[in-house]
A protein has these predicted regions:
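Extracellular/periplasmic carbohydrate-active domains that bind, remodel
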Residues: 1-315
Length: 315
């Protein structure tokens, strides 16, 4: 999977595919118009790997107007949790790295479930292995947002190791470990081209979210890292996973829909998942259904994928 970057806004391009001198095909396209680009350096981010750049990047995100883009240029940006907003376009340029802090006391906590005033409903945020449980907020978080595109040639590094998040990984210390990328109740979210690595726990975890696209993304975690699944859609609908490269220490893709409590209460399956042209290596399972699947799974398609050195292909 090859991405195209550094294109000008509102400009026409023709992309051709050639076999030597012979043109096999072409497609014409026009990039979206753009009002302004907000460079996070203009908001105070240094990208020196020392200053905590969380608030400066978050300010750029919140200030970004419609039909505009937040740009994170080359540099190493120390962060805790960044929160997405609807309509956001966020680009991580080549050489840009978001590197997570590893001090859990610096992270917000997502409570497990908050009771509604009429006591007839629950608002779920924190989740751990299919149950409503408190967790630290993800490095990149989206809650109730829609129409978001995050793309580029940059890296999102959870910075996890056995000295921090991977130490006694099954023990809840105030809250459970954060995800590297977490969505809750979101729609129309796309990730394109980015590299995700060294996740504290599950790497990409969309939860009760629909109409998602993961295209040309790379997920890399050490082979001995605990519970660092690559992509775990949980009770999600209409998910496209195309050209993603996985190399990690657990399941590459684990399709989920909650344990008994969540499955019985919400009866929300994972539905309409299309997995194509992905490379999955060094994991326990390439594509697995469960565990945590009390809500069921409907219409899962896997085609043209390569499984290399995984313990199991399909489970």
């Amino acid at each position: 999977m090859t991405g195209l970057y550094h294109l000008k806004p509102d400009s026409a391009y023709t992309v051709s595919v050639r076999d030597g001198e012979k043109e096999e095909g072409s497609i014409s396209l026009r990039t979206e118009a753009e009002y302004v680009t907000l460079n996070v350096r203009q908001f105070g981010a240094k990208g020196d790997g020392v200053q905590d750049d969380t608030h400066f990047i978050q300010a750029a995100i919140m200030a970004c107007p419609k039909n505009s883009r937040v740009l994170i240029p080359e540099g190493t940006y120390k962060i805790t949790s960044l929160f997405l907003k609807s309509g956001l376009r966020l680009e991580l340029a080549k050489g840009a790295e978001l590197r997570a802090d590893t001090d859990s006391s610096h992270f917000p906590i997502f409570p497990a479930a908050i009771q509604s005033y009429d006591e007839k409903a629950e608002y779920h945020l924190g989740t751990w292995e299919g149950n409503p449980l408190p967790m630290f907020s993800g490095i990149i978080c989206g809650v109730g947002v829609k129409d978001v595109v995050i793309y580029g040639e940059g890296v999102i590094n959870g910075n996890a190791s056995k000295e921090n998040w991977w130490n006694n990984p099954k023990v809840m210390r105030t809250a459970f470990r954060p995800r590297l990328f977490f969505l809750c109740g979101c729609r129309y979210v796309s990730l394109q081209g980015l590299t995700f690595m060294n996740s504290p726990s599950w790497t990409l975890h969309p939860f009760f979210s629909d109409d998602l696209r993961f295209i040309g993304v790379t997920v890399k975690n050490p082979a001995d890292s605990p519970n660092t699944d690559g992509l775990d859609p949980e009770s999600c609908k209409n998910v496209e996973i195309l050209g993603v490269r996985f190399s990690l220490g657990d399941d590459c893709i684990a399709v989920k829909s909650g344990k008994i409590y969540m499955g019985k209460k919400y009866k929300t399956p994972c539905e309409n998942l299309n997995i194509r042209q992905c490379l999955m290596e060094n994991g326990h399972g390439a594509v697995t259904v469960g565990s945590e699947m009390a809500g069921g799974v409907i219409h899962l398609n896997v085609e043209d994928c390569l499984f290399r050195h995984t313990d199991r292909g399909l489970r």
